[in-house]
Amino acid sequence: FGETSGETKGMWFGPRL
């Protein structure tokens, strides 16, 4: 995930949603 942001640490559901 993390298509919007390069952070797949825990914001993979944050920036998108």
Curated annotation (Swiss-Prot):
Keywords: Amidation, Neuropeptide, Secreted. The keyword Protein biosynthesis does not apply. It is found in: Secreted. Expressed in abdominal perisympathetic organs and abdominal ganglia. The modification Leucine amide is found at residue 17. GO terms for biological process: neuropeptide signaling pathway. Its main location: secreted. InterPro entries: Pyrokinin_CS. The keyword Secreted applies. Signal peptide: none annotated. GO terms for molecular function: neuropeptide hormone activity. GO terms for cellular component: extracellular region. Belongs to the pyrokinin family. Myoactive. This is Pyrokinin-5.
